[in-house]
Amino acid sequence: MVLLSKFDFSGNKIGEVEVADSLFADEGDGLQLIKDYIVAIRANKRQWSACTRNRSEVSHSTKKPFKQKGTGNARQGCLASPQFRGGGIVFGPKPKFNQHVRINRKERKAAIRLLLAQKIQTNKLTVVDDTVFVDALTAPKTQSALRFLKDCNVECRSILFIDHLDHVEKNENLRLSLRNLTAVKGFVYGININGYDLASAHNIVISKKALQELVERLVSETKD
């Protein structure tokens, strides 16, 4: 069992949160699994829909635009030629196959678990009490949010905030306070967490309830 310190809005340690050892279970080549997962996410976000028509696919008559001789113009075969407006495209993009990358559910969950464990082991994850997200601010105030990060010794560099979905109607003051900080890269909910968000964030601030829900989901699926 791993114990993580829990902080309040003033940066004071007010308790500890238990994290199951199974969260840190070895998955063999974990770095390769994380790499495959990130590649799949980035590849599948692309549309892969860029497609152009060549001269044989555009809708044009095959009739010569003018006679071969006597006009003074260069000879032309048809208006589908690339040099004409509306003609075919030469060497344009054309998807030759489905380039989406598939990754199964078990691999996806394992990658997220490894990324979360990695943040904990490198001290890049800060657990805060649920009141920080719900009751700490009575009104949006950026200075208060910035002071909170400094009091908790959170490095102001690519910070991801993770909260529980139950607080969606109660954490508006904190969300609005963080919105003006360039170091804050996102505010997400544990149930919708994406491994790419975890990988791209340098520091993570998570509520106790969100962490417990996330760990429980990842660990239970590992046992299955």
Curated annotation (Swiss-Prot):
Entries under SUPFAM superfamilies matching the protein: Ribosomal protein L4
Region listing for Disordered, in residue ranges: 53-74
A Gene Ontology term for the protein's cellular component: ribonucleoprotein complex
Annotated disulfide bonds: none
UniProt GO BP: translation
Subunit field text: Part of the 50S ribosomal subunit.
General function of this protein: One of the primary rRNA binding proteins, this protein initially binds near the 5'-end of the 23S rRNA. It is important during the early stages of 50S assembly. It makes multiple contacts with different domains of the 23S rRNA in the assembled 50S subunit and ribosome.
Similarity comment: Belongs to the universal ribosomal protein uL4 family.
Name of the protein this chain belongs to: Large ribosomal subunit protein uL4
Species the sequence originates in: Chlamydia pneumoniae
